[in-house]
Amino acid sequence: PEDIGQSPGVPTPDGDKVDLEAFSEFTKIITPAITRVVDFAKKLPMFSELPCEDQIILLKGCCMEIMSLRAAVRYDPESETLTLSGEMAVKREQLKNGGLGVVSDAIFDLGKSLAQFNLDDSEVALLQAVLLMSSDRSGLTSVDKIEKCQETYLLAFEHYINHRKHNIPHFWPKLLMKVTDLRMIGACHASRFLHMKVECPNELFPPLFLEVFEDQEV
């Protein structure tokens, strides 16, 4: 709806507001969005071979990063909107007021910068695999195996990019910088989630949303 994020909200500790109506609308699409990240991970053979505990840590760590990437690559410069979960087009202020605060700016800025890369579905999938297989997540036991998995995806990614022959100078290192940007978005969201927990009624949080983000380190 066009008026999402426009009604009066609750002030949060970092100076912006949570529009509870907008927050409620966003939570309706969060569960299927998280489920799609899980489904993606399960399709990767190397992920399925990891211990269950490591799988959970990796999924919790990358979930916001991958959801942000999927939104960012659907940035429309003409309308200045992102499409969330493939169905909800939102403007920067709507996403900000719906609970994400400054994280909204980071996702929109990423969307603007990614537009020049013109990534295809395979490149987005490989980028998601690289984010998923991050061996520096706290608590992992199979660190070496996960690191080798990520290296495999990075090599495949670089090979595919060279095959596509993008016209942007230094395309590969510039794209890898976006991994750093997405990691920062994930870290910022972990902090924002604490604000959302304080400002929004608990019943508005879907169980899967809580399960994924409640125990993340800030």
Swiss-Prot record:
<dbReference type="InterPro" id="IPR001728">
    <property type="entry name" value="ThyrH_rcpt"/>
</dbReference>
<dbReference type="GO" id="GO:0004879">
    <property type="term" value="F:nuclear receptor activity"/>
</dbReference>
<keyword id="KW-0862">Zinc</keyword>
<dbReference type="GO" id="GO:0000978">
    <property type="term" value="F:RNA polymerase II cis-regulatory region sequence-specific DNA binding"/>
</dbReference>
<dbReference type="GO" id="GO:0008270">
    <property type="term" value="F:zinc ion binding"/>
</dbReference>
<keyword id="KW-0539">Nucleus</keyword>
<dbReference type="GO" id="GO:0048384">
    <property type="term" value="P:retinoic acid receptor signaling pathway"/>
</dbReference>
<feature type="binding site">
    <location>
        <position position="36"/>
    </location>
    <ligand>
        <name>3,3',5-triiodo-L-thyronine</name>
    </ligand>
</feature>
<dbReference type="InterPro" id="IPR000536">
    <property type="entry name" value="Nucl_hrmn_rcpt_lig-bd"/>
</dbReference>
<dbReference type="Pfam" id="PF00104">
    <property type="entry name" value="Hormone_recep"/>
</dbReference>
<dbReference type="GO" id="GO:0000122">
    <property type="term" value="P:negative regulation of transcription by RNA polymerase II"/>
</dbReference>
<dbReference type="GO" id="GO:0030154">
    <property type="term" value="P:cell differentiation"/>
</dbReference>
<feature type="binding site">
    <location>
        <position position="85"/>
    </location>
    <ligand>
        <name>3,3',5-triiodo-L-thyronine</name>
    </ligand>
</feature>
<dbReference type="InterPro" id="IPR001723">
    <property type="entry name" value="Nuclear_hrmn_rcpt"/>
</dbReference>
<dbReference type="InterPro" id="IPR050234">
    <property type="entry name" value="Nuclear_hormone_rcpt_NR1"/>
</dbReference>
<dbReference type="InterPro" id="IPR035500">
    <property type="entry name" value="NHR-like_dom_sf"/>
</dbReference>
<keyword id="KW-0238">DNA-binding</keyword>
<feature type="domain" description="NR LBD">
    <location>
        <begin position="1"/>
        <end position="215"/>
    </location>
</feature>
<dbReference type="GO" id="GO:0070324">
    <property type="term" value="F:thyroid hormone binding"/>
</dbReference>
<dbReference type="GO" id="GO:0045944">
    <property type="term" value="P:positive regulation of transcription by RNA polymerase II"/>
</dbReference>
<protein>
    <recommendedName>
        <fullName>Thyroid hormone receptor alpha</fullName>
    </recommendedName>
</protein>
<keyword id="KW-0804">Transcription</keyword>
<dbReference type="GO" id="GO:0090575">
    <property type="term" value="C:RNA polymerase II transcription regulator complex"/>
</dbReference>
<comment type="function">
    <text>Nuclear hormone receptor that can act as a repressor or activator of transcription. High affinity receptor for thyroid hormones, including triiodothyronine and thyroxine.</text>
</comment>
<keyword id="KW-0805">Transcription regulation</keyword>
<keyword id="KW-0863">Zinc-finger</keyword>
<keyword id="KW-0675">Receptor</keyword>
<dbReference type="GO" id="GO:0002154">
    <property type="term" value="P:thyroid hormone receptor signaling pathway"/>
</dbReference>
<keyword id="KW-0479">Metal-binding</keyword>
<comment type="similarity">
    <text>Belongs to the nuclear hormone receptor family. NR1 subfamily.</text>
</comment>
